[in-house]
Amino acid sequence: MKIAHLTSAHPRYDTRIFIKMCHSLAKHGYDVSLIVADGLGNEIKNNVAIFDVGAKTGGRLSRMTKTVKRVLDAALKLNADIYHLHDPELIPIGLKLKKLGKKVIFDAHEDLPKQILGKPYLNKPTKVVLSKAFTLYEHWACPKFDAIIGATAFIRDKFLKINANTVDVNNFPLLDELANTSDWSKKLNEVAYVGDISKIRGIEEVILAMNYTHGVKLNLAGKFGDKALENKVKNQQAWLKVNELGFLNRQQVNEVLAKSKAGLVTFLPAPNHIDAQPNKMFEYMSAGLPIVTSNFPLWREIVEGNQCGFCVNPLNSNEIGDAIQYIVEHPQEAEEMGKNGRKSVEEKYNWLIEEQKLLMLYKGLSA
């Protein structure tokens, strides 16, 4: 059975697409290819054949036209049995492949209509119109696909209303990847923020929160998406308490988490954040770190239900800083919260469980 995963927007070694899904399918005997658009060339890695259609050029419009056309051409050459799409802009490709008699899965990583409502570069009327338009487009296109995968149960439930063959495959961590046995007493008075750095993810409030801590450093790993925002936060007095690490590979992230005492996920209350399940939340838990997260109902259920951290108002830097300081000053309690988080990952929030859902879906489509 020949499988082709398609992305026009994600990096070739994307954690969900390549490290988890492609690797799991290849491990279980599928002939797996991955089409990407990064200009880094073709290769075979972990028994997955990676085909590069060339780097993305221009802005969003160029990516959604020229790059998508190149992805379609590469997909047709592969002549796969099942095509697995990872970007909304690839939906037209899926419809064309369906007309050719191919089986198509659309993987909804995000609730895009809600995500559009949180775009800072769009004015409110434009957000509302685009969000409603894409909702109508989803309702028209997605019932035509053989299956839909939602990255969360919330996204699954949304698509179940229009496509009965919808499952959730959560982006939970690989059990062994971030596990560490470092002695808590040897950890530094440092906390970690790992991931994309943006206003909507609360970076301004996190930096200002360091003003309310004493003897604590912030390990900041990731890239700024906006130069003006980067300049703004770097001009804050609190920036003196930041270890700027830039983009890190998975092993480097593991090393940072091993020496940190907490992980921060304090996204601002944008429409697509409220019901989201940030990967980093579960990765921090997998690494045995207590977490400081936004106090959204779903996040509160996860954090407080598993006694693995604190939920705070993400708009209140003082509250974020107080939670960080408490964790640093109460090592026994912090270590216990970290163990609780790790235990919950071992029991329910891990890729082994999600892998079985993925394999069952593919087994059904292969029959």
Model region roles, listed by residue range:
Residues 11-15, 201, 251-256, 261-285, ...:
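Nucleotide-sugar-dependent
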Residues 39-40, 217-231, 246-247:
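Glycosyltransferase donor-sugar binding loop
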Residues 4, 149, 183-211, 218-219:
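Conserved donor-binding/catalytic core segment of Leloir-type glycosyltransferases
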Residues 319, 326, 333-348, 357-360:
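A short, well-ordered alpha-helix in the C-terminal region of glycosyltransferases
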Residues 230-255:
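Nucleotide-activated donor-binding/catalytic signature segment of Leloir-type glycosyltransferases, i.e.
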Residues 36, 51, 128-180:
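Donor nucleotide-sugar binding/catalytic pocket of nucleotide-sugar-dependent glycosyltransferases
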Residues 23, 69-76, 96-100, 106, ...:
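Membrane-proximal helix-turn-helix segments that form the acceptor-binding/catalytic region
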Residues 305-306, 310-317, 326-332:
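Conserved acidic donor-binding segment of nucleotide-sugar-dependent glycosyltransferases
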